[in-house]
């Protein structure tokens, strides 16, 4: 987000829960702070599904609200719990010119509940927002790569990966320290049992997943220059919890092959083999 003016900004607040509601109220938005207050659905067992349904208000909310004349955006944190911890995450202004961009900030779930309650009692409530965030120049950062050469098909590459960076307010243990450790364990365990893979096993710890995936983009660019042949890639980026299975991005024929591997995982209670998205860096 951009910063607020030096003295902050104070404005009336308009609360919406969906983009449909935002468009319905577009003529009421000018000069106001838009408060996106759509909670994640607690009835969904898969928290990533609940997250996916709610994340667009944080990702695109400021861009759309700015086009309707809003002066700022407050977004309910994407969190199933009621607590006082605001959550950081990616947001975008799309192709809005710098002069049209408005400040955006997350509010904790408890804060969102309180603000919504206060607005129900006083529609003319004014909200004061002050923040001094800014974009600094890029600095050079690095992917970390290691590999075990394949003994039969060294030019066929299998990637196991995770991302090194995390949001600055957290310690990154789940996102994605656990994935980094899991990725590094793969070659360590194979070497421990003296297993030599037929294809090249490459461990890639990507930098800059959280705000642009530039580590993955750079890896892809370099790989194309070298004309490398990747036959398989997997990323662990879902926290350090008990493994449940795999979301697979492939065509139907390859997915059928991968699904046949499920019998090897059943003794470990790993049962989820479904077509879906791959890791963000993959």
Locations of regions flagged by a protein language model:
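Soluble metallo-hydrolase cores and metallopeptidase-like ectodomains found primarily
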Residues: 1-27, 93-173, 185-198, 221
């Amino acid at each position: 987000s951009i910063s607020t003016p030096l003295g902050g900004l104070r404005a009336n607040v308009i609360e919406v829960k969906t983009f449909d509601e935002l468009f319905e109220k577009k003529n009421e938005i000018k000069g106001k702070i838009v408060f996106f207050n759509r909670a994640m659905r607690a009835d969904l067992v898969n928290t990533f599904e609940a997250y996916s349904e709610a994340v667009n208000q944080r990702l695109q909310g400021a861009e759309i609200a700015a086009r309707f004349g809003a002066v700022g955006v407050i977004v309910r944190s994407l969190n199933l719990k009621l607590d006082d911890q605001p959550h950081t995450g990616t947001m975008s202004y799309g192709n809005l010119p710098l002069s049209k961009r408005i400040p955006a900030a997350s509010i904790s779930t408890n804060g969102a509940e309180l603000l919504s309650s206060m607005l129900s009692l006083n529609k003319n409530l004014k909200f004061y927002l002050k923040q001094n965030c800014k974009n600094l120049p890029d600095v050079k950062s690095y992917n970390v790569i290691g590999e075990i050469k394949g003994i039969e098909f060294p030019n066929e590459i299998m990637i196991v990966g995770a991302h090194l960076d995390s949001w600055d307010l957290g310690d990154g243990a789940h996102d994605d320290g656990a994935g980094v450790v899991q990725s590094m364990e793969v070659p360590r365990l194979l070497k421990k049992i003296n297993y030599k893979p037929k294809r090249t096993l490459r461990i890639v710890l990507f930098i800059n997943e959280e705000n642009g995936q530039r580590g993955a983009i750079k890896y892809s660019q370099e790989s194309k220059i070298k004309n490398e042949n990747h036959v398989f890639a997997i990323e662990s980026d879902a926290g350090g919890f008990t493994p449940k299975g795999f979301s697979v991005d492939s065509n139907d024929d390859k997915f059928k092959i991968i699904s046949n591997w499920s019998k090897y995982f059943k003794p470990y209670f790993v049962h989820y083999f479904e077509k879906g998205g791959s890791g963000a860096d993959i």
